[in-house]
Amino acid sequence: MMCFPYVLSCPAEEAYVAKDTDFSSTLTRIKSENPEFVFIPGYYEEVGLIIKQAREMGITVPFMGADGWDSPKLIELAGAENLNNTYITNHYSSEDPDENIQKFVQAFNDKYSKSPDAFNALGYDSVYLLKDAIERAGSTDSEKVKDALAETKDLSLITGVVSIDENHNPIKSATVLEYKDGKQVFNSKVNP
């Protein structure tokens, strides 16, 4: 469980080990610090138990995390009511009202009779990222395509706007989802 001292004050930073099941001592320390929110960049297996135990201890502040929370099992582990007032960032949401996203969702649903998830959207985007690089390279030569990929700047895709930085890391949009009564609900999109 982390905080970002350059954004907000950070009253405490705690850690846990994967596969832990009892978080009471850690949560007791966190509760004593009276935080504004708790950030857990973990996976649903532990996060579900942490949130359940936190709510049982009376910790009602928002919890925030990332795509490691994105599993139906999180709801089973935490309980739908305990997930209220929790938020995650993810790559995409089928509820995003953006017109291009809704066209993608409709086309995917028409073909596969289900809504696309984040992995479907990322797969779709990876094809268009490569297509864009090939077109800008004017070639399918691997070195030219690699160089074009590295120069990607402000490419608008289904999962958001993507640029590649000097270390070859993607700088991209993040979709904020909120849990309401056990369901992920689109909250907002943060662009770089």
Question: What feature does the model see in each segment?
Answer:
Residues M1-P192:
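Extracytosolic ligand-binding ectodomains
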